[in-house]
């Protein structure tokens, strides 16, 4: 079989057949013809009949004559094979169904005022039927060529993905794409247009598919179920992605560092780590992001929008994923389990972070001082040490922070709210993560053991900090006096000595402190609370260090030796 040409997939129409179509259908013909011409050029197929294309671009008839003239003329070309953008069935609908539906039952006998008019109309109608029948047969004959064209062009487009060529470039930001449809979707980012609106809540979307997916939030329907673990999803694509958790398959590998991913989208996101590119900028505050989704989520900080509400406790969230994660607090569900040590997590990303403990891999390196980290977020936080930047400021007291999350935690000090309560002892906390850490006191689970001295820890962060005692590493240095510290938090606390700042004030007696933890300990004096009880003799203490010291009376332990 020879190479595919324009003539292989063309349909010929006579003038009589052309006149069967109304103005709208003729315009449709022109649009499809020009669109397919562009597709052929893109696929590298030569089109010889350029006079016809020029004629169509100028909005003229496919031949130079008036429509009412009935003399026989050379046939016109029609390429209603509509590759990709119009599948085969559309061809049949365009002529076979649309024309027949429009003229098949025109009732010409009823509308005629005279016998002559009736005969004339009847003759015209028969001619139309002949025209439609001819058109139908030509469409059926063309089907096999359509399939050949589809197969050829799909293969051609598929090959482009492997070559890495991106011929379609955005004029706004310069980003390139391998397909025209991808460029079209991307351009909406710059226009901000959201034509698809949800009738239920009024939320608008850039794509109709996003609106369709969003509607399921209101119905709560989850028709796609995982056969492995029984978890249900509202989208088939989400189920497909979920299944990879069970198989552990990672097909997509980074050529830069060799790291592998189970999704191509994750690989694309990862690549930005190496380039450092942040093309999505917030117009409100100027902050830039690597992904458009992160920018969308960030914008909600400025608007204060929290559309996702927990039915259990009423807490609202900016993202549906945050609500899903939050619900596990109430259910206690921990579906993500570490195969290495058996520890389970409520969030998949936490499991991913946890796994690094076992590998001790640190792929994220600071260019300033050479220090390496196992998470990109830790590297980002570390970089602030060199810049000294604190962009997140508390409106209540003016204190500034390097991270937005730290500011969020800090704000709770001013509100005094403690929504997270320990079921074991009744103690309440302002932050959920602190409650999680507190619970370890009751379980005494300490999975992290130091190989150097045998000491065990209940948190990986405490274990990491402890290791520095043996290495003697003190990377955080005070510019004022030169003193170095193991932890950045210790340096922050130390700096207050030079400034004399005491931002944490007791509402009960007015006494001020330079650390929030010291204020918390101080408050116990007023309440008389002694939550730390010795299991050996029953004596209670208001601080955990005091209990630790007391226990040595029973154990006779003397850890401090004179050198």
Swiss-Prot record:
GO terms for molecular function: DNA binding; zinc ion binding. The gene is ZNF708. It comes from Homo sapiens. GO terms for biological process: regulation of DNA-templated transcription. InterPro entries: KRAB, KRAB_dom_sf, Znf_C2H2_sf, Znf_C2H2_type. The keyword Metal-binding applies. The keyword Repeat applies. The lineage of its organism: Eukaryota, Metazoa, Chordata, Craniata, Vertebrata. A zinc finger (C2H2-type) spans 140-162, 168-190, 196-218, 224-246, 252-274, 280-302, 308-330, 336-358, 364-386, 392-414, 420-442, 448-470, 476-498, 504-526, 532-554. GO terms for cellular component: nucleus. It is found in: Nucleus. CDD domains: KRAB_A-box. This is Zinc finger protein 708. May be involved in transcriptional regulation. Residues 4-75 form the KRAB domain. The modification Phosphoserine is found at residue 544.
């Amino acid at each position: 079989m020879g190479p595919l040409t324009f003539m292989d997939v063309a349909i010929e129409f006579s003038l009589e057949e052309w006149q069967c179509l109304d103005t709208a259908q003729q315009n449709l013909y022109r649009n499809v013809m020009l669109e397919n011409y562009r597709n052929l050029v893109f696929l590298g197929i030569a089109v010889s009949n350029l006079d016809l294309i020029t004629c169509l671009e100028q909005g003229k008839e496919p031949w130079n004559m008036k429509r009412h003239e009935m003399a026989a003329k050379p046939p016109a070309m029609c390429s209603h094979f509509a590759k990709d953008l119009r599948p085969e069935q559309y061809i049949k609908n365009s002529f076979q169904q649309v024309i027949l539906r429009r003229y098949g039952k025109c009732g010409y006998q009823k509308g005629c005022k005279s016998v002559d008019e009736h005969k004339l109309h009847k003759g015209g109608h028969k001619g139309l039927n002949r025209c439609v029948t001819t058109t139908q047969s030509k469409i059926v004959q063309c089907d096999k060529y359509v399939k050949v064209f589809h197969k050829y062009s799909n293969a051609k487009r598929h090959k482009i993905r492997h070559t890495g060529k991106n011929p379609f470039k955005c004029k706004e930001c310069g980003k390139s794409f391998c397909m025209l449809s991808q460029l079209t979707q991307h351009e909406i980012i710059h226009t901000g247009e959201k034509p698809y609106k949800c009738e239920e809540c009024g939320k608008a979307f850039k794509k109709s598919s996003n609106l369709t997916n969003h509607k399921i939030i209101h119905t709560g329907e989850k028709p796609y179920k995982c056969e492995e673990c029984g978890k249900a999803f509202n989208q088939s694509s989400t189920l497909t992605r979920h299944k990879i958790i069970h198989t552990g398959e990672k097909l997509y590998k980074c050529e830069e560092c060799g790291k592998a991913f189970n999704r191509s989208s994750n690989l694309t996101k990862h690549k930005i780590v190496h380039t450092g590119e942040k093309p999505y900028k917030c117009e409100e505050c100027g902050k830039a992001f690597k992904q458009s989704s992160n920018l969308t989520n960030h914008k909600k900080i400025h608007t204060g929008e929290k559309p996702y509400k927990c039915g259990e406790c009423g807490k609202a969230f900016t993202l549906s994923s945050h609500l899903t994660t939050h619900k596990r607090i109430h259910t206690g569900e921990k579906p993500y389990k570490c195969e290495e040590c058996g520890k389970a997590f409520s969030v998949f990303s936490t499991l991913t972070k946890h796994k690094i403990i076992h590998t001790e891999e640190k792929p994220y390196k600071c260019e300033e001082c050479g220090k390496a980290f196992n998470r990109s977020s830790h590297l980002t936080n570390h970089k602030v040490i060199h810049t000294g930047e604190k962009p997140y400021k508390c409106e209540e007291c003016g204190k500034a922070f390097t991270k937005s999350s730290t500011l969020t935690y800090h704000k709770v000090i001013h509100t005094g709210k403690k929504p997270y309560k320990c079921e074991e002892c009744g103690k309440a906390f302002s932050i959920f993560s602190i409650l999680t850490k507190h619970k370890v006191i009751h379980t005494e689970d300490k999975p992290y053991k130091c190989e150097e001295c045998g000491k065990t820890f209940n948190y990986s962060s405490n274990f990491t900090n402890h290791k520095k005692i043996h290495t003697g590493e003190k990377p955080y240095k005070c510019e004022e006096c030169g003193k170095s510290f193991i932890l950045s938090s210790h340096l922050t606390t130390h700096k207050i000595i030079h400034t004399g700042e005491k931002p944490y004030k007791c509402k009960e007696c007015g006494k001020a402190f330079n650390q929030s933890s010291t204020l918390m300990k101080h408050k116990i004096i007023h309440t008389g609370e002694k939550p730390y009880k010795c299991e050996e003799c029953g004596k209670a203490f208001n601080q955990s260090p005091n209990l630790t010291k007391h226990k040595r009376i029973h154990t006779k332990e003397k850890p401090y030796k004179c050198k």
